[in-house]
Amino acid sequence: KDFGSWKFCDEDDIRKVVGDNIGKIKISVMADAERTDYHEDILPKEDSVLDMIRVATYIHQIPTAIDMIKDASDKGYETTCNLMAISTVQEGQIRSALEALIETPVNTIYVVDSFGALYSEQVRDLTKMFLDYAKPAGKEVGIHTHNNQQLAYANTVEALIEGANRLDASLAGLGRGAGNCQTELLVGFLHNPKFKLRPLLQCIRDYIEPLREKLRWGYSIPYMLTGRLNLHPREAMKFMEETDAKDIVAFFDSIYEEE
């Protein structure tokens, strides 16, 4: 079995967790372009506990992503578009995608550092570019970072300072591979009294840390190397899953030979 139930986010599974009355909490799912039968898989909003559909797309999938956004919006959902692997895309292609996206009902457009390859000045420039298109169209800009080079938190803060106001984060950086920006770090930076750190730490202690013992995520040298080379982390993930994943020099040699 390659995937667990949360790969698919079936409505019944979600309801088992959140119930029917979830108050002010917003629930969202990620839908990958070209990897879902979204016309059938995504229910009308009135039949779902979901509030938001987050469409994840590579640059060559933009036409499909736009149709997914329109479909989800027509069904009553808030929508976002996550432009993945942005570190591999030429500026002209990014601008063309943004021009198309601002004509859709999408609420937020995300800068996504899928490979954990971006540095702060690149994040600033990309955030400014996204805002140049999104803000006049009445849309928000978000940031989604990966921690390959220990920059997920710092780059999220850079985007926030530039004007991004949708910040992706997870408790203890929980996420595939190198993980993501840590929620508990952001709470400290925001200095907003409505955000309480202690309940987050309690959740990390009770639920996230036990998971960490079973699932390996977070910064490691193999993920750092793929981030430096602006590569998909699949080779690092494969290496980390091996029984003797200690020869980091051999891994270095293997990926630099490929380069």
Task: Label every PLM stretch briefly.
Residues K1-E259:
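Catalytic cores and adjacent flexible loops of soluble metabolic enzymes
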